């Protein structure tokens, strides 16, 4: 008969590698003589052992963010570049360490909810949601700008009567539906970040990312200081990268200046423009931007 405290093979208590086994006594303690090489004992017993590898969280998020860039219709590396700009700006303005950590994670996860509204966008415009998202990112606010965006976005392959009906529908309901689309995206992205364990501060920054300083943003129409402070930094940085990477450095700086006090917080814009004058954009499109960004990770190696 086996002793009452016999050693047995039990599943990995962490629960994240169900095929990995470890050796424990019945009472839960570990036999010290087996700890030097428990995996070898598991293999001898016929169990498959999955090696654990420690991969920095930033690298995992960066890989995921590249897929999100494509879904968002942006040049691959957009979230990484936004993260680079935001972290450099955080250093320049002396943001405290905890906020820098939140900002870094929120930048890489900022578009986590971007695929949640794909079906709604396609249904509304009848066109590829990825193309529309990329185009909308460089569309100004206002009735004329939105009308021009809508006309350009209608599928040319559709019969003219159908396009006219779609245009009328968007004119009558587009504002409400666009709000619902943006609300879904922001709320879903924040929820994903929270469920992934990044905490409420990261979720709050993602939720408020598309709010505008003057209250004209989405999804809640927040104004000024009511907007999450880290979201204000991310908003300006992501806007700058979109124009720099799809148009030119001059366009990025011009749009940033034009949106000062409307889309973006004036103090953030001023600090960002000052950093640009000191060469912030010099490395933005460098092929090793990922490595440069990882090197800025708060609390990183």
Enumerate the predicted regions with their spans.
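Intrinsic-disorder-associated, low-complexity terminal segments enriched in Asp/Asn/His/Tyr and depleted
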Residues: 12, 16-19, 37
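Extreme N-terminal basic, low-complexity initiation segments
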Residues: 2-8
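Histidine- and acidic-residue-rich, metal-dependent catalytic cores
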Residues: 34-35, 46-301
């Amino acid at each position: 008969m086996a002793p009452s405290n016999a050693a047995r093979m039990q599943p990995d208590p962490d629960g994240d590698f169900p095929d990995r086994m470890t050796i424990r006594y019945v009472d839960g303690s570990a036999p010290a003589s087996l700890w030097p090489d428990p995996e070898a004992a598991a293999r001898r017993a016929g169990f498959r052992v999955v090696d654990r590898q420690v991969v920095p969280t930033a690298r995992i998020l960066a890989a995921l963010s590249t897929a999100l860039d494509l879904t968002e219709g942006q040049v691959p590396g957009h979230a990484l570049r936004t993260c680079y700009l935001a972290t450099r700006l955080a250093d320049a303005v002396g943001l405290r360490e905890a906020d820098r950590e939140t900002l870094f994670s929120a930048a890489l996860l900022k578009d986590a909810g971007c695929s949640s509204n794909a079906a709604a966008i396609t249904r509304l415009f009848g066109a590829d949601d990825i193309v529309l998202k990329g185009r909308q990112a460089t569309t100004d606010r206002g009735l004329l700008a939105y009308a021009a965006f809508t006309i350009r976005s209608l599928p040319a392959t559709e019969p003219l009567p159908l396009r006219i009906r779609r245009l009328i529908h968007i004119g009558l309901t587009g504002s409400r539906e666009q709000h619902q689309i943006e609300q879904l995206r922001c709320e879903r992205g924040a929820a994903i970040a929270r469920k992934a364990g990044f905490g409420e501060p990261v979720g709050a920054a993602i939720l408020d990312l598309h709010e505008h300083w003057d209250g004209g943003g989405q999804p809640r129409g927040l104004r000024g200081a009511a907007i999450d402070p880290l979201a204000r930094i991310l908003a300006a940085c992501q806007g700058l990268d979109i124009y720099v990477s799809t148009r030119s450095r001059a366009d990025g700086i011009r749009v940033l200046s034009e949106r000062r006090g409307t889309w973006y917080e004036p103090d953030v814009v001023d600090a960002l423009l000052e950093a640009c004058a000191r060469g912030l954009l010099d490395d933005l499109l460098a092929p090793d931007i990922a490595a440069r960004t990882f090197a800025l990770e708060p609390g990183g190696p």
